[in-house]
Structure formats: C-alpha cells, structure tokens
Amino acid sequence: MSGFQSSLAGKVGILTGGTSGFGYAIVRALVSQGANVAVFSVDELPAAASLEWQRSAPGKAEYFTQDITARGASEKIVEQTLACFGKVDFVVVNAGLAIRFEESLLKLSLEKLAAAMRTQFELFPIALATLALAAARVMAPRYAPIPPDDTGHRPDSGAIVVTLSETALSPLRDDLLAYAAAKQACLSVMRSLAATLGPQNIRVNGIAPGFANTAGPRKFYGRFPQIRADIEAKTHLLPAFMDPGAVVPAVLYLLTDNYVTGTVIPLDGGYNIELKRYFQDQ
C-alpha cells in the first residue's frame, strides 16, 4: 500500500521513558512487531519484567539507565543505540514527569514556580529538540537519498514521535502551569522539527493522551475525587481512565506511515472536552 512501510521488523528505535505507563506499552508493541528498541529511562526495569515477555517476541529491547536532562545525554543515547544495534530508524520521545502545585498560583512561591518551569522545560522541549536532532544526524544520511516511487511518495522514511498531552492542546489547570507550558513548547518544537527534517525524509509527529491509568492521574484524582465524580456524572463521552496501551495503535501508525508529518493525534476519548467544560463552569 502506498504511503506505508510493510513492517517494523528489523527497524531500530530509541525510546525514552519505557519502564512504565505509555512507554512500557509502546516498547512491548514495537518488539512484538519485530523492532529492536534501545530504551532509556531514569528508572531501572526489573530484569524479570523485561525478560518474560521478550522470550517469544521477534524483536528485542535493551534497557539503559539514563537521565535525559543530563549534559550530553542525547549524544550518549544515540551512541549507545548505534553500539547496540548499528543504526537508528525511529525515535519515540516519551519520558516525562508532571510537576503539580499544591498552592494556587497567587500564593505559590515565585522561586518554586521558576524552578518547576526550568525542570519541565529541560525534561520536555529541550530534551525533545536535542535528542531528535542528535538522532536525525544519524538517520538523514540513510533516509534522505531514498527516491520517491511512481506515486511520488518515498517508500520508507525515518520517524520521530513525541508524547505530548491534552494539556498541550487545552491548558486549563493552574496546578499544571509549568507542565502545560513545557508541553505546549514541545508542540512548537515538534512542528519546527517536522519542517526542518521533512526534506531529509524524516517525519515528526505527536500523540496527545488524556488522563490514563498511570501514576500521575491516579495521584491527581486521589487528591480531588470530587472532580472526577463531577465530570463522570455528566459526561456522555468516555469517562474512564484510558489504558496506557490505548496509545499503541496511533504510535504504530505514525511510525509506519510515510506521508504524515507535523501532526498531533489526540487520544483522550473526548475526556478533555468535558474537563474543559468542568473548569470553565467553576
């Protein structure tokens, strides 16, 4: 089919933040598709958890402990991937941590706000830009020379996918100001990279998940159970926490399609619509 790679088998990818949540679900899917993935996370994955599901998978995942905000981390990540698998075909930038404020913004220490902003920007847009470009410098010599087929489309391309957030599309909550600002900056970086790397036959896209059954949302609703109850009582959409694996089809699509770039796919079951309505009504 024009516009699609036939398979991820034999492809090599980099994924950050792959020991839990979205990242872990994506890694398992990629390996099941025959891809080899170098996974980088500040948290170590228990050996048993890594080996059990890999035994029957056609691909392979190698785990490395790495803080993506450390000096020289992006170059090191690419170098380790090349040493392990010999090439880079795609990158999934997924690592993240949301800083939430307990106080209202009018009462929040400005020093605390500034520190949170610095941390979130280092973790999201800065890490995205540096890792994407470090990987692109390796991918471009292989992918830029690929000629178009008789339909005018190139039969293969490099790919970068970034995990954004519904807060990047509709930043509404003051407790997530730093996180939302950093994710919005990621959106800008993603689009700039798409424009810059397109001529090199490297596509750059994003997914924007909503509240999922991961640690952050569970903690938020644990603090504010009435918000969840209020939203779920009046929504006609899909109120439940999304399973982390729900992002997998979108990620696989963005990694295998050879035409789409500069695009964000929202993945929140319509939940953000009701969340926006809730906060606007308060």
Where are these regions (language model features)?
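Conserved glycine-rich cofactor-binding loop
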Residues: 12, 19-20
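Short, small/polar-rich loop/turn modules that mediate ligand/substrate recognition or access, typified
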Residues: 198, 203, 260-263
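Conserved glycine-rich Rossmann-like NAD(P)H-binding loop of the short-chain dehydrogenase/reductase
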Residues: 33-49
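Catalytic loop of short-chain dehydrogenase/reductase
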Residues: 97, 110-116, 140-185, 190-199, ...
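C-terminal substrate-recognition "lid" of short-chain dehydrogenase/reductases
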Residues: 240-267, 272, 278
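A glycine/serine/threonine-rich, flexible loop-to-helix segment
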Residues: 50-52, 106-107, 199, 209-235, ...
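Catalytic Tyr-x(3-8)-Lys segment
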Residues: 120-122, 224-246
